[in-house]
Amino acid sequence: MPAPCNCIETNVCICDTGCSGEGCRCGDACKCSGADCKCSGCKVVCKCSGSCACEGGCTGPSTCKCAPGCSCK
């Protein structure tokens, strides 16, 4: 029985409730953006240049929205 957080084996992306943080394997198919993401390696990180803040709706580099006049990395 694969761990509930192992989305490579289960093909189901569970990040928050139901995932204890054990046996995390996310892969490209499973990325979490919520603060309650138990698997640190699954967390989507949006980085903006300098001290610019990230705006909501960021699910990865391609959808990263930074404050106006800022660029995403």
UniProtKB/Swiss-Prot annotation:
Question: Cross-referenced InterPro entries, in alphabetical order?
Answer: Metalthion_mollusc (IPR001008)
Annotated Cd(2+) 4 binding lies at: 46, 58, 64, 72
Q: Which residues does the annotation say bind Cd(2+) 6?
A: 54, 66, 70, 72
Q: Where does Cd(2+) 1 bind?
A: 15, 19, 32, 37
- Mind listing the UniProt keywords for this protein, alphabetically? Cadmium, Metal-binding, Metal-thiolate cluster
Could you tell me one molecular function GO term of this UniProt entry? metal ion binding
Q: Could you give the subunit structure recorded for this chain?
A: Monomer.
Described function: The metallothioneins are involved in the cellular sequestration of toxic metal ions.
Family per similarity comment = Belongs to the metallothionein superfamily. Type 2 family.
User: What name does UniProt use for this protein?
Assistant: Metallothionein 10-IV
- What's the source species for this entry? Mytilus edulis (Blue mussel)
The organism's taxonomy opens as: Eukaryota, Metazoa, Spiralia, Lophotrochozoa, Mollusca
